[in-house]
Structure formats: structure tokens, C-alpha cells
Amino acid sequence: MKTHNFSAGPCILPQEVFKEASESLINFDNLGLSVIEISHRSKSFVAVMDEAVALVKDQLQVPDTHEVLFLQGGASMQFAMLAFNFLSENGKGQYLDTGAWSSKAYKEAAGLGNAEVVASSKDANYNYIPKGYAIDDNADYFHCTSNNTIYGTQIKEFPQTEAPLICDMSSDIFSRPVDVSKFDLIYAGAQKNLGPAGATLVIVKKGALGKSGRYIPTMLDYNTHISKGSMFNTPPVFSVYVSMLTLRWLKANGGVEAAQQRNEEKAALLYNEIDRNPLFVGTAAVEDRSTMNACFLLNDEAAHKETFDAMIAEKNISGVNGHRSVGGYRASMYNAMDLDSVAALVDCMKELENKF
């Protein structure tokens, strides 16, 4: 029986990707070697890295002004790395606080220099995206998080600003088209819509670097990795390889535009049931609901949770528990999630209603 995996991350990936990756663990590129034991300097892996970078550029229409990197350390390392590269000693970084990850990014910058929060939805447990805030055009940068997995909110329109725009797109990159030219830095951990944990995708505007005027540790300097083609040190070979396979799959299935249509269809199916069914309630403001992560509660948990959880288990639905900090339920619907899996969850919700 199929398991419907709604885990927030590490995420579901296409079965075709799993199949090819598993074969390459035994014999990669007909070398008689595993992909995880080949040299990262070999022609075979250099070709993988080159194709992965080319596919990122193709799918997101990355302009020539920007570089594409595959780094390590996760998005969490980017919190400090971006501050080292963009925050000057006498300048300031501005942050939109929409959840746990943006808050952590702000704290890293505040430990290095002048950082300030321009708006926050913490007062309402991060259940909406703030609007109508002012950004200082003279700030060193403005940072936002496009999608919030814990609270189920998503930025639908990015702010217009003269300040360099930086965004953590870890949980919704490649789920919709993005105008990369408007951003000085985009970063994303691979383990949502791209591949297994271990690689971090970075898209950085070359002309934005070298201006902070501070000492930058070698490994935290974007220019270090640009100059070496993401191979200053040994890259996360397997994660980059699987990410490349996922990007191939994405392109073969209509690209980012087609992914957006599928994601909106899946999200609409689930949110319509949440709104229709009197036993459930959504937690995020309707206008800010994420297409990637739908968060919801039972109206009467004491009366219905045990039954609903048993029904979910019987249907082989996995990973729908809400984040430990908020509870409830969370259905993560990344690119590789089939509509049939969302329909299976919706059927459970309808069955619960019929029981009571």
C-alpha cells in the first residue's frame, strides 16, 4: 500500500528520482563505482554540478548578473553567512519577522552588527504576513522568509525596495515562478523541493558582494565559493546529484509554471475541505495561506483526535502532525506530492465528519 508522506522535511521526492539515485549508489555513470565514492573533481561529477547549476538557471531564469552555488551548512548557516557578506559595521540589516526561521536569521545578524525588525506577526502566533511596513532604502539589506512551514503562511507579493532584497526560500523554491533579478540573494536548504539534506542552494548577485568592509571567514565568503565553482572544499556530492535529478524531473514535467498549477490545485482541495468541514479550522490568515504547508486544528480535539489519528494511520497517511511548538496538524504538499495523496487526506476528514 502506498504511504502518503506529508512530512515537512526531509521531503517527498519523485519516485523516478529515487529509482535512478538508488541505481547510481551501485553503479554511477557506468563507472563501476558508487556516486558517493567518486572524486568530486572527476569529469563525471563536474558534469553533475554543471548540469545542476544550468537547470537552476533554466528553471528560475537566473540572469547573468547572478551566480548559482551549492554550499553546505543548511539555511541556518546562511543566517550568519549573509550577514558577514552584506552587513557593514556602520550599516543595518532589516528583517521581516514571520516565524521561527526569520527570527533565527535576525538573531544571527544582531550578534554581528545592527539589525532591526521592521514588522512582525509574533503577536498573533505568526498566523499572518505583516503588510504596510516601511523599509529603509538605505539599509544594507532587507531580509524575508518566503514560506513558513511551522505556521503555514507564505508571502504572495515581495516588497518593492531600493535596499538589497534577500530571501530564505527553503520551503517553496521551485514551487512557483520568481523574478530572481529583484533579489540580491536567495538561499534554500535542499530538503524541501530539491533533494536530500546536505546541500544549500544559493543564488547571489555578483555586484552585491565585497561591500561589507569587514573581515569574512574564508568559508563564509560567497566569493570564495564563486571562484571555485562550489568546490572550494568537497561538496555534498550525493545531495547535489539527487538535486540535479529532481531538477531534471521538474523540467520534464512542465517546469516551475506547471508545478505552480499543480500546487495550487492540491492546496485548494485541502483548504476547501478545511473551510467546509465543521470539525476543522485553519490557523493561517486566508490571504496568506501557504500552498506548501497547510496548518489546521480539530475544533474539538478531546472528542475527535483519537479517532482521526486512527483513521489517518489506517489510510497510510504519514507526517501530518503539526510542529511540536504549535501542535495540531500540518500537511506539507511539496512539488512531488500527488493530488491523490491530498485526496486521501481529504477523504479522512470527510469520514470523520460522517462519524460525528
Positions of predicted regions on the chain:
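PLP-dependent enzyme catalytic core of the Aspartate aminotransferase-like
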Residues: 3, 327-356
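Conserved PLP-anchoring active-site segment centered on the Schiff-base-forming lysine
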Residues: 88-101
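Active-site C-terminal subdomain of aminotransferase-like
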Residues: 190-271, 285, 355-356
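Conserved PLP-binding catalytic core of the aspartate aminotransferase-like
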Residues: 280-311
